[in-house]
Amino acid sequence: MSQLKLNPYFGEYGGMYVPQILVPALKQLENAFVEAQADESFQAEFTDLLKNYAGRPTALTLTRNLSPNPMVKIYLKREDLLHGGAHKTNQVLGQALLAKRMGKKEIIAETGAGQHGVATALACALLGLKCKVYMGAKDVARQSPNVFRMRLMGAEVIPVTSGSATLKDACNEAMRDWSGSYEKAHYLLGTAAGPHPFPTIVREFQRMIGEETKKQMLEREGRLPDAVIACVGGGSNAIGMFADFIDETSVELIGVEPAGKGIDTHMHGAPLKHGKTGIFFGMKAPLMQDSEGQIEESYSISAGLDFPSVGPQHAHLNAIGRARYESATDDEALEAFQLLARSEGIIPALESAHALAYALRLARECTKETILVVNLSGRGDKDIFTVSDILNGKEE
């Protein structure tokens, strides 16, 4: 590993646990990334796409009616306003540009909720790249609007029926494909997890979320927030929000994992607080495992958080106590989803509703003037059928 230019570990987490055949591809990717980061023309093109195609900077909205406590201001970082409907577009444009720079003609991706798949499809359409998206068969069924969007933009969507037919299985299939095609294809990983250098690349291509938030906060309030709150599945929207605040020790960093039907039911997706360290998806990280070390199925009402592991930098921030990780149940997320729609006229993604749910819980407990920023990582159009079915079921 001595030829690596960047540290593949965050404390004890991370690394490059992949078949030998993929090591040259990952080293080539790291090298290209380091060069691109130092290349002004690459940065200028990336910035131009973010501004004039994706619509950055995104708004920082002070909620008018949402806060349950008059002493607490709740701001929303509006990644839901980004082209494509979620924060995913940021880093996908970065990686797609990087792939073109490396001379790759094809993109391979995995997707859970379909948001990363949609973002990948739009970037490939824009930049003239062939696009293949692996998606668990269960997710294909529960996210049909996004499947149609991907196909409409020219992507090939491949349903994965192995294992639990969800995101982790799509990840495995995508990785398998890439190991036989990396000469011509780039694997565009959708979260800040997986083997090095992906967690670092994804963080750097998402960090404008926190950078903009910091600047907007200083303009609006003349100070930094007391806490920034983001949902955590693999952890890319959260690390994008956290990265620029890590050195600002007055700002609490709070990640919210999905507690599903309740932590004690084992039907959750909260490996950071309730998993054990293991090797999965090319990295060493907290993982949902049974007593024999087999990977347990994760569960969440939101397909994008339904992931049995978490990015290595989050594991490290948790271990050193710089960030804290909480959880919110399906029911709490559903309640927050409806509350934001009714109180502010904004329909959040179910993923983002988990962060919102915890922010509301925290706001109720505050006893002094407090400013909270919730990363509203995506919009909820994709979830209206899921929520409608649940609410109708509940009302019967």
Curated annotation (Swiss-Prot):
Species of the source: Shewanella sp. (strain MR-7)
Enzyme class: lyase
Keyword Amino-acid biosynthesis listed: yes
One protein family per Pfam: PALP
Protein name: Tryptophan synthase beta chain
HAMAP family given in the database record: Trp_synth_beta (MF_00133)
Reactions catalysed, as given in the entry: (1S,2R)-1-C-(indol-3-yl)glycerol 3-phosphate + L-serine = D-glyceraldehyde 3-phosphate + L-tryptophan + H2O
PTM annotation (N6-(pyridoxal phosphate)lysine): residues: 88
This protein's pathway: Amino-acid biosynthesis; L-tryptophan biosynthesis; L-tryptophan from chorismate: step 5/5
Keywords for the protein's UniProt record, in alphabetical order: Amino-acid biosynthesis, Aromatic amino acid biosynthesis, Lyase, Pyridoxal phosphate, Tryptophan biosynthesis
Lineage start: Bacteria, Pseudomonadati, Pseudomonadota, Gammaproteobacteria, Alteromonadales
Chain segments annotated as coiled-coil in the UniProt record: none
